[in-house]
C-alpha cells in the first residue's frame, strides 16, 4: 500500500517539494541559501507578529512603544533585536542567493528568476517601510528623502508624493499606512515564494557544472534536508550572536533620537543593505535620472537572461567571465562603502565610476566575454 505522504492531497504536495524531490547530487553549499531565506522569512514573520502586538503606529507614541517593548515586555528586547538583525541576515542571504544565480547561470530559468527579482523588490519595500516604524530621526528623514524621490515623476510627481504621505509631509497618516504595508507585505512575499518554488520545480534545480543532471539525481530527503539543517544551525547561531552581543552594530545611532522634523541629521543614509543602490542614486546629479538609475540597478537583473551569449551555462569553466563576476562583487562592495559616505569629493567621483562599471558589467562586458569565450573554444 502506498504511503500516506504520497497519496494524501496536501501531504503529496509537501512530499514532492521536500521529500521525494529529485535533486542533482553535486549541488554545493551555495544551494543552501534558498532554504535559509525561507527560514529568515518565517523568523521575521514570527518576531514581527509579536512586535506588532505591542507596537503603536502613532507619531506620539511609536518611539515610546518600541522603548516599552525593549524595557517592559517579556523578552521584548530579544524579539526586537532578532527582528532588526534578522532583516540584515535576510539581505545577506538574498545577495548570496542572487550571486549564486549569476555565477551558475540559474537565471536561464527565466520565470523562476523574474519572480525572484519581484521578490527582491518586495523585500526591499518591506524593509524600507519597516525602518520607518520606530519613528527615530533616521526613520523620519529616510522616509522623507526616499518618498520625495517620487516627486521626480513628470507631471504627477507632487500629487503622487502627497498621496503616499496622506498629507503635505511625512506624518501620522504616513506612519499608519507604512505599518499596514509592513504587516501585509511579508504574506505577499510568502505567496510569491510559493510561486517561485512552483516554477523552480517545473524544471528542477540547476547544478554547479550547468549540465543536465537527470541521470544522477537523488532524493531531497534525507541528503539535502540534513545539509540544509547545518545551514540553519550556522545562520541561527550567527543571528543569535549578533542579536545578543552587538545588537546595534548595523544600526544608525541617529535612530535612538525621536523623530524631529525641525532637525535634519548631518548624513541621511539608509540601512547597509540599500547603500549600493543609494550610491547609484546619488551618483547622478539629476533627480529623475537618479530615480531611474536606482530602479535600473535592481531591474537590470531581469535582462541578464536575455544577454547570455555563452554556450556554457555556468562560470565554472569560464575564467574570463569569472574575473568579471568577482569584479562585480568588488564593485558592489565599493558602492556600499560610497553609499555610507558623505556626498563630497573624492566619494562622488568614485561612486560615479563604480556606478558606470556596475551597469557596464551587466550590459556590455558579460555578453562580450561570453561571446569571446565561445570564439576561443571554436564554438561560435
Swiss-Prot record:
Positions bound to heme b b562: 83, 182
Keyword Metal-binding assigned = yes
UniProt keyword annotations, A-Z: Electron transport, Heme, Iron, Membrane, Metal-binding, Mitochondrion, Mitochondrion inner membrane, Respiratory chain, Transmembrane, Transmembrane helix, Transport, Ubiquinone
Write out the annotated subcellular location: Mitochondrion inner membrane
Q: How does it sit in the membrane?
A: Multi-pass membrane protein
Give an example GO cellular component term for this record: mitochondrial inner membrane
Any idea which GO molecular function terms this record carries?
Answer: metal ion binding; ubiquinol-cytochrome-c reductase activity
Nucleus recorded as keyword? no
Q: So where does heme b b566 get bound?
A: 97, 196
Q: Which PROSITE patterns match?
A: CYTB_CTER, CYTB_NTER
Cofactor(s) the record lists: heme b
A Pfam family that the UniProt record links to this protein:
Cytochrome_B
What biological processes does GO assign it?
A: mitochondrial electron transport, ubiquinol to cytochrome c
The UniProt record gives the binding positions of a ubiquinone as 201
The record's comment on cofactor binding reads:
Binds 2 heme b groups non-covalently.
Q: CDD domains attached here?
A: cytochrome_b_C, Cytochrome_b_N
Please name the Gene3D superfamilies in this protein's record. Answer: Cytochrome Bc1 Complex, Chain C
The portions of this protein that span the membrane are: 33-53, 77-98, 113-133, 178-198, 226-246, 288-308, 320-340, 347-367
Q: Where does this chain mainly localize?
A: mitochondrion
Additional info? Heme 1 (or BL or b562) is low-potential and absorbs at about 562 nm, and heme 2 (or BH or b566) is high-potential and absorbs at about 566 nm.
Q: Which family does it belong to?
A: Belongs to the cytochrome b family.
- Self-association and partners: The cytochrome bc1 complex contains 3 respiratory subunits (MT-CYB, CYC1 and UQCRFS1), 2 core proteins (UQCRC1 and UQCRC2) and probably 6 low-molecular weight proteins.
- What is its biological role? Component of the ubiquinol-cytochrome c reductase complex (complex III or cytochrome b-c1 complex) that is part of the mitochondrial respiratory chain. The b-c1 complex mediates electron transfer from ubiquinol to cytochrome c. Contributes to the generation of a proton gradient across the mitochondrial membrane that is then used for ATP synthesis.
Name of this protein: Cytochrome b
User: Which organism was this protein described from?
Assistant: Sarda sarda (Atlantic bonito)
The opening ranks of the lineage are: Eukaryota, Metazoa, Chordata, Craniata, Vertebrata
